[in-house]
From Swiss-Prot:
Function description: This is one of the proteins that binds to the 5S RNA in the ribosome where it forms part of the central protuberance.
UniProt record, GO biological process: translation
Classification via NCBIfam families: bL25_bact_ctc (TIGR00731), PRK05618.2-1 (NF004131)
Gene: rplY
Family: Belongs to the bacterial ribosomal protein bL25 family. CTC subfamily.
Binding partners and assembly: Part of the 50S ribosomal subunit; part of the 5S rRNA/L5/L18/L25 subcomplex. Contacts the 5S rRNA. Binds to the 5S rRNA independently of L5 and L18.
Cellular component per GO, a single term: cytosolic large ribosomal subunit
Protein's recorded name: Large ribosomal subunit protein bL25
Amino acid sequence: MVYPVVEAESRVGFGKGFARRARAAGKIPAVAYGLKRAPEHVLLPAAQMSLIMRRANALLQLKIDARESLVLIKQVQRDRIRNIIEHLDMLFVNEDDAVTIRVPLRFVGQSYAGTVTSVENYSVAVTLQVSQIPEALVVDVSGLQAGRRIFASDIALPDGALLVSPPRLLIAKVDPVRRATQEPPPD
C-alpha cells in the first residue's frame, strides 16, 4: 500500500518556547515511539500534516535522516481557538501489526418516513491489522422503522477485525417523530 511520505526534521529543542517558535515557523512538534525503538522527537511540516489529518487514523511514511518508517497518528493536541495542531504523538508500526483503534462511523440512508434517527456513538473500538484500517465503517439506516436500535455488534467489520467496544453499545436508534400538539386558544 502507498502512504504519504512526510519529511521530518530531528528536534533538538524542547519546552514551550521552542514549540511556539517551531509552530510560528510552520512546523508541528511531534514524537514517534513504539516497536521497542527509542522515541524520536521531530518537527513536521504543518501544511502537509493538515491535509493528511483530514483522514481519521492516518498512516504515513515518516522520513527522518534518510530512514523511512511507517507511523500511525495516535494522538493530536489542538488549539481549538486558533484551530492549529499543537503536537502529535505517533506510533511506529508494521503493516502486519494488529492495533486497537477507534474507527469513525459514517451513516448512510434515511430511516422510514415519520421517524428520526438519533446517533448515540460516532465511533467504535476495533482491533485489526494496520494495512486494513478503514477510513470509516458504514452504518446503513435505510428504511429502518420506529423502535429499531443499532448496536455495535450490528456493524459490518473488515475481515479479520475484532470488535473491542461492548457488543451492546448503542450506536443509533430510530424513534417516531413527535408531532406538536396544538392547544386550544385560551378564553
